[in-house]
A protein has these predicted regions:
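Extreme N-terminal starter segment of soluble prokaryotic enzymes
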Residues: 2-5
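Conserved catalytic-core motifs of GNAT/GCN5-like acyltransferases
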Residues: 101-103, 116, 121-138
Length: 148
């Protein structure tokens, strides 16, 4: 069965929590993810590969601006285009948005390369933004309906 991307719902928020727990140094709890289901500004997606939860993307959209909160792909599913597919799915779903913003660890070259390939541009940085370990964040933005 090919990759399937679905909106996170009551049947998949625990899958999203498991992905985050495996991949992120500060994962959201199941409770927080469940609360996201009732947030009208929250849009979360889960990617399944052969029926197995493989990736997760969480964004908030407010006044046409998308803030990418978390993206994670389980290690055994990495380098298969899942993160890119999640991002492209989100762009399609939120087609009326004007821009998308994210932070990426300075050392995360693979993620930064993915974001650049999707049209994100570096717009700044935040000193010591991340902990475990302490690291700067690179700020990136993509204008969704034409370059500004």
């Amino acid at each position: 069965m090919p990759m399937q991307i679905t909106a996170m719902d009551k049947s998949s928020y625990k899958d999203a929590a498991a992905i985050m727990a495996q991949c992120l140094s500060h994962p959201w709890s199941e409770k927080v993810l469940f609360q996201e289901l009732s947030n009208p500004n929250a849009h979360s997606y889960v990617a399944f590969e052969n029926g197995e939860a493989a990736g997760f993307l969480s964004v908030w959209e407010v006044c046409g601006e998308v803030s990418i909160n978390n993206i994670a792909v389980v290690e055994k599913f990495r380098r298969r285009g899942i993160a890119k597919a999640l991002m492209e799915h989100m762009f399609t779903e939120l087609c009326d948005a004007v821009s998308a913003n994210l932070e990426v660890r300075r050392s995360n070259d693979a993620a930064a390369a993915l974001y650049r390939s999707l049209g994100f541009k570096r717009v700044g940085e935040r000193k010591d933004f991340y902990s475990r370990p302490t690291e700067d964040a690179i700020l990136m933005t993509k204008y969704l309906n034409g370059e500004k």
